[in-house]
Amino acid sequence: MEENKQKALSAALSQIERQFGKGSVMRMGDSTVSRDIEAISTGSLGLDIALGIGGLPKGRIVEIYGPESSGKTTLTLQVIAECQKMGGTAAFIDAEHALDPSYAQKLGVKVDELLVSQPDTGEQALEITDMLVRSAAVDVVIIDSVAALTPKAEIEGEMGDSHVGLQARLMSQALRKLTANIKRSNTLVIFINQIRMKIGVMFGSPETTTGGNALKFYASVRLDIRRIGSIKKGEEILGSETRVKVVKNKVAPPFKMTEFDILYNEGISRESEIINLGVQLNLIEKSGAWYSYKQEKIGQGKENVRLYLKENPQVAAELEQQIRTELLEKKLSVLASSSEDLFETIDD
């Protein structure tokens, strides 16, 4: 009986391959199936670690949402900068018509190489996104934002006209079409979203994101970004303290949280993260206000240590590598070995 089943399965597989092409269906244990997910760094060491794979996954949809001025666009511009450092191509679909090239340049984005589109309608924005994805030549596409993807019927209609559920239908239709193309081209597509309040909610959070429920389902990673405080030097505000929660993660364990500093005109402070994580892992010793590395004092107060690491990039790079090895690479090797065991079990 088992032999007959095996023959029937082989016949079905060969028929599928003849009809739909080679690779239409395959065993997960086949070496041709990629088990490793490529990632693009977020520019934040803590967030890369919280995401579990060292960044945002390629070939997937990511949603970043939060209140106004919480750092959503800054985070995506940092992702573009990291992508360009790796020699990749990035596109920014500016539906809000609010992209500031000089600010992007300060964050390390090569603005001359960045593809930018300012579409007139939501349909146009999503069609451009689909065409860029299908080209398989773009590594990252950012859509800023879902709330600004206004359907054509709404733009061409009168001010007071009712268009119930039009944007949600548009998003649902577009994502059905986009998902397969994104996987095939291995492009990272990031949707920035805004928060709205649901009326009449008695229990639970009244917060919701715009554009219906489709994006919640199709996104492999959802990040909730919030501003939790200000960074001050006397009376002057230098930046904001930011918290990011990984609300959904299909590629690693979810619900991890991280905090980092966003400095105005500079972006995410890599040095501040190195200090915080270095102290946590005892790579940097903290005694009172003094910080030491390899028995040598490197500064009094966090701000002085940050300046020291900025002036000594080789020390910062050395510390970052130690932190990545300790918190990320060890976890990834454990995950890889456990997945190898799983695939071996499937093959058996």
Curated annotation (Swiss-Prot):
InterPro entries registered for this protein in UniProt: AAA+_ATPase, DNA_recomb/repair_RecA, DNA_recomb/repair_RecA_CS, P-loop_NTPase, RecA-like_C, RecA-like_N, RecA_ATP-bd, RecA_C_sf
Residue ranges of coiled coil: none
Domain of life: Bacteria
Record flagged with keyword DNA repair: yes
Biological process terms in GO annotation: DNA recombination; DNA repair; SOS response
GO cellular component annotations of the record: cytosol
CDD domains registered for this protein in UniProt: RecA
Amino-acid positions noted as binding ATP in the UniProt annotation, renumbered to this chain: 66-73
Entry similarity comment: Belongs to the RecA family.
Name of the protein described by the UniProt record: Protein RecA
Higher taxonomy: Bacteria, Pseudomonadati, Pseudomonadota, Gammaproteobacteria, Legionellales
Gene: recA
